[in-house]
Amino acid sequence: MEQQRKSLKRILALGACMLWPLQAGAASPDTDALAAKHASANYKEFVELLALPNDAMVPADIQKNTDRLEQAFQKRGFQTRQLPNNGKPMLYAELPGRDPAKKTVLFYAHLDGQSVNPKQWQQQSPWEATLKQKNAKGEWEAIPLEKLYGDQVDPDWRLFARSSSDDKGPIMMLLTAIDALNEQGRKPSVNVKVILDSEEEKGSPTLGAVIDQNAELLKSDALLVLDGPMHQTNKPTLVFGNRGVALATITVFGAKQGLHSGHFGNYSANPAQRLSQLLASMKDETGRVTIPGYYDAVKIDAAAEKIMAAVPDDETALRKRLGIAQAEKVGKNYQEALQYPSLNVRGMAAGDVGPKARTIIPETAVAELDLRTVPETPPAHLIGLLKKHIEAQGYHLVQGTPTDEERAKYDKLAAVASDDVSASSSAARTDMQSPVGAWLYRAFKDTYGEEPVRIRMMGGTVPTGAAVEALKVPFVIVPLVNADNNQHSNDENLRLGNYVAGVKGLIGVLQQPF
């Protein structure tokens, strides 16, 4: 009886797409059933796609994936074109019959994946999709893949494979949503274009150039980015921006060579101690950056504060997971903290430690920084403020290694080297009240029967900047995969309930008037 009860529960879970609690009667049974039906029908195609290695560093891998996905889009009636890109072509697809009375939406996803170390995976191969469920101990254990093609699929089962969630899963969700509409004879409410990036995992260094070269082809009214994890609650999620990143290396100089600490201690200044004092001057004990002007350009209005406060973050659980007693005091909450530029010391070096440590005063001390930017504080602005602050602490900035003349003239010497930041690493944000934001909000609310979680700006950096700068259109990130998907790591996975619900959400988006 218990086994029958579990089987019935699984069947109902698939048919009703029980990814998250929905308000009673809010979700369309037709959309639920349609999404479940076509998701099930396409699992085999998904597994076959996952079997293709797609290392962003291997052109042959990229070509095979581009070819396979081109066939997949053509099968759904898309017109396609491979966009040349140094041996790693991007894929463009468009549904024919463009209606000038409709808005045109460009869907972005990426077909490349992170490199893998097969020995770190708990299965035979990262490219051999493995179906798993949790056992009584809460551990993932493999079950026959054939169960995926049956009629008793548990939405909590997961498919483990490289790129299952990042980003082949969302690509298959879009294709499956198109299948569902095609079967019903329905046309999307918007003109649909798609671009599949082939180097996202390398930071999309050529995305802007490819878009510029195909500007007319990719012309659109809005950009939807199908990438990234949903909110931790697994509720429908819309993300309206991302921080950028700038990198800087600070070198503080001491004597021309390492000195014996007995002979020269108390006489020659230690650059490691000076660097420590310099870094300490950049932030206070609450974690706020004290460099003058660092936050000044950031303004958050009451409407944005209200939306951020409504994000269902469990900060007590978050701090417990991170293993910290309290958060830094940059914003009122986690979401607000991400709206400001940050300053992070990502590495330091001076002398040696452990068995290799010597009794010397090191000649240099180096700190590597990453500065997370926001649209109001571009990289050049923050790097400029950083340099001014260092000079205000009494340092003379040099280019490269200081000359003998500079050493004789200045007591405190330092160098700041900053990387040229491409548009792919730029911060970008769309107004949450913009037409595209309102359109997606309505689509998700109508489809799922609850308000989506709206993230004003996520803390990480994704390559939207290049696309937004080249296309000159508003964008929204539409994450569809489970937050605990092990993205970029070993044992990457996709929850089947998320797959079905993602199909459902995209059906809703494609049917919502814009």
Label each PLM-derived region with a short phrase.
Residues 2-12:
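Bacterial N-terminal signal peptides that target proteins for export
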Residues 21-24:
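N-terminal signal peptide c-region/cleavage motif recognized by signal peptidases
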Residues 102-193:
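Active-site metal-coordination/substrate-binding segment of hydrolases
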